[in-house]
Amino acid sequence: MEVTVMTQSAVSVEHTKDTTDLFILKHKDLDVAMMKMDVRTGMIEYILSVYLPEELPAGCAPDGTGLGEWWKLRAIPDSRQGIRQVLSRLSEATSQSLMLSSYGLSLADHYWIQPVGQELYWKDLNFYENDFGDELGDILTDSERERSVSDGISKLSPSVSVNGDMKKKWIIRGGRRYLLKVNPSYHSQQAVNEVIAGKLHERLGWKNYVSYEVGTIHISGRKYPCSLSPMFTSVETEFVSAYQIVAAYKVPNDVSLYEALIQQAVSLGADEKEVRAFLEYMILTDFILTNTDRHLNNFGFIYDPRQHRLSGMAPLFDTGNSLFYDYDVIPHGGNLLDIPVNSFSKREADQLHYVKSDAGVKLERLVHFPEEAEALLREYTDMTDERAAETARTIEEKIEYLNLFFQGKKIWKKERYW
């Protein structure tokens, strides 16, 4: 489908940064902390006072330590292609200062910052209940449409508080919020990989995942595939990343990061059985798809801010960096057991150490799944048919390796030691 976005009437209040360098961190309408900020760079310089330690973002100490890192991770990373040019065009020094123009509002949680001396309210600003314009999102994804000079560019957008290297923006379609992601490089495969992951979860009967669809976006006069996924937070719930759970925790030398995360999550209200089942399923399905980028900000928990506890696992999302999208030569055979990843382990196969059950990954349900993935790659990307077939073959091989693993083979070792 082709993405067409109706221009929404944006929230009318936009922050001007020439009034004060003192800001209040807000959680909806609660005053959480007072901060001094560098309004040019958008960076938090120091915390003046913490009023409600229990309302601080997860991962921050009661005295506010960690707020600076939390704020930085909320912004568009410097590593995102084209962000320097966007900032220059908008006369912003950093992506943090761009975020400051939008009060730090997000569609992941209910935090924002209020300039001291201004009387503002959550109900009037938040992007859950208030529409927002699309022009800044267009710039961030290189998908600008013809606009009148008089239209201007509103910086008040949730698109400025979405991290990750892939270009993305929030859009409104039929009253619902969707995250659109695009990368014209690598055959635009990342967008299609998200849909393939959804087909995998569907076959396995797994319910807790974000459903992606493939759309089309115009960039420099050409059409490219993009992915569209609905928002999974709400005015009642927030997303807390796994990284936030362990950010302020010193992991003992005799405890793995995997176990430390589970322990910390349980201490914050999560159900241990649910967490373990989710993580094992995630490791197994990421293995099938060779998802190399399941770092601690790419999965997490749903947080209930009223009860101050984790209420469950956030749905699985962000499987775009998989299926050898950025490999020139696709590996096969034993080389598939030596894949470097950015996750609990440095090597993909080593993560199977943590898996104690099949976690609902019934391999017999995946008959013809490789062919389904191949068909999607052929339909939506411009890769050759040969590469699509070769990519699908890695799925077949990974399923065969998991079958051996379920039979008790220690496939992370050299084959002679299985």
Question: Whereabouts are the PLM-identified features?
Answer:
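Glycine-rich phosphate-binding P-loop
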Residues: N291-T292
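Canonical protein kinase catalytic loop motif
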Residues: H295-G300
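Phosphate/dinucleotide-binding and metal-coordinating scaffold of catalytic cores
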Residues: M1-L284, I288, F301-W418
